[in-house]
């Protein structure tokens, strides 16, 4: 669920895997791909949310560090392996190219973000719509662009719900402030499980997610009660 606060173990369980070791996971299951992102100061890649509040710019991944004398940041991010097989970068880029040629719909990607050590938040589902392969600091890097979408699960898998209103992404720095301010628990009952970052005032009613004053932590029960009152 979007903006749900979860542990690493809960994230893996949600995706029905033992571990998630890669940041990019093309078609982790039959329905969608998965990315792990971070905007922390020590993050290895430059991921960010664009100013529209609904688009993620996600950096591709470096070559593996196979020995101590290899610095991945001095090498181009690869599209293929030495044997010619597509890397995760290549798989994501190929999906974009096929989408642009009208061969397929955009790849659906589920995004999770690391907030603190051991604390993750689901950012929701996105359409993978574009990429660039650009030169930065004398090497080539991938930049993937993902646009937020609303998804419903059904017996056949997943379906895009274009009738549901999209909501802007709560910035990571706001989540960090709110987590510390609310001490990692529901502000109403003090629960410490099934937590969500909640827009205190919905966007449709004039709320914004750019300040901590409009975001709080709620448990699933109180988040549902609030939704019922709004509707």
Residue ranges and their predicted role:
Residues 114-162:
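Compact mixed alphabeta submodule
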Residues 36-37, 144-148, 217-219:
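Short beta-strand element of the conserved SAM-dependent methyltransferase core
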Residues 220-231:
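Long, charge-rich boundary regions
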Residues 2-121:
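Acidic, glycine-rich low-complexity segments with interspersed aromatic residues
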Residues 189-217, 230:
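Histidine-centered nuclease catalytic patch
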Residues 111, 187-188:
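A structural signal for short, well-ordered beta-strand segments and their strand-loop junctions
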Residues 104-106, 123, 141, 192:
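Eukaryote-biased feature marking scaffold/signaling PDZ-domain proteins and nuclear chromatin regulators
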Residues 96, 150-185, 209, 213:
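Short, charged surface segments at domain edges that flank catalytic/cofactor-binding sites
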